Amino acid sequence: MTELELLGPRASGEPLGTAVLKAVAEDFQVDEVLDIPLSGQGEHLWLWVEKRDLNTEEAARRLARAAGVPVRSISYAGLKDRQALTRQWFSLHLPGKADPDLSRAEDASLRVLKQVRHLRKLQRGAHSANGFTLRLTALAADHQALDTRLEQLKQNGVPNYFGTQRFGHGGGNVHDALEWAARKALPEQRNVRSRLLSAGRSFLFNQLLAARVADGSWARAQVGDLLAFTDSRSFFPAGEAECADPRLAILDLHPTGPMWGEGASPAGAATAQLENAVGARQPALCQWLAQAGMDHERRILRLPIGGLTWHYPEPDILQLEFVLPAGCFATVVVREVVDLVSAGQTDSPCVF
């Protein structure tokens, strides 16, 4: 499956040129934002860890081995890219135990930067945001046009697509999810099951968002929509008055789309018709998600880009810095600006 099939159309027009992302790990830096005051005491040891070209799950296994505890005793808030330089929190459950020597887990790809005790473990999804520093190299685009486009994105946000990372190489996770859905079965392995359910659900959301980008309604509230604030999981229906709420214009409040699961969508009017039409194209997948116990949830259609700044360290390098809510993808910001090409191959798209 192509990127266009997995995501959907761009909202800002054609890309302004090409660039390379992730030529080296330092070109894609992620810092987890966690707004939890740590007490300094308790049976959970929280670790602030820097990883280079190492995925979150492998880092967790290495930390658990070094601490001499089962991997189920280690927790993290979210998964981070492997091909990147990332800093994120982990927690180890160590009731009645002293702080372990974690030096055996450390090498060029993993460093423990800080250790703090706390009363509770780190919960999945506990982080509020991720801060990104991206260096786009081999840049072939006009700086003035880039500045204009980036100012536009700063003011308007971008479609909140799930990035291609969610779907595996060539959309392989979506293909697998569709096959399992057709058989009305679930993989036995928990991590495989979770990955495929997530991919199938994300694919359906992107299909809905693609339709609203195509008709221009992705950033505009309409009667029947369900609205949500940027950092809230709750939502409320939009009538005429809600569609005129000034918080929509300042990117605090947004229309939402469905994360398919058990139960009907509470949306109304044209919004409900479109959501039902998208679901009707993949009935087996929708039923599979519901039968797997997934609840119907909502995700904002528009992604506000917090604190977006940029500069050009060299004429052919664009450096971007910004903050995104947890669960959102930096690459969907970049695709609204330039086409990404792989290092050493300037004529073929890069898949992350």
UniProtKB/Swiss-Prot annotation:
Domain of life: Bacteria
Keywords: Isomerase, tRNA processing
InterPro entries: PsdUridine_synth_cat_dom_sf, PsdUridine_synth_TruD, PsdUridine_synth_TruD_CS, PsdUridine_synth_TruD_insert, TruD_catalytic, TruD_insert_sf, TruD_pseudoU_synthase
CDD domains: PseudoU_synth_EcTruD
Any Gene Ontology CC annotation: cytosol
Protein name: tRNA pseudouridine synthase D
Family per record: Belongs to the pseudouridine synthase TruD family.
Record EC number: 5.4.99.27
HAMAP family associated with the record: TruD
Keyword tRNA processing in annotation: yes
Residues making up the signal peptide according to the UniProt record: none
Any one GO biological process: tRNA pseudouridine synthesis
Task performed by this protein: Responsible for synthesis of pseudouridine from uracil-13 in transfer RNAs.
Active site (UniProt): D81
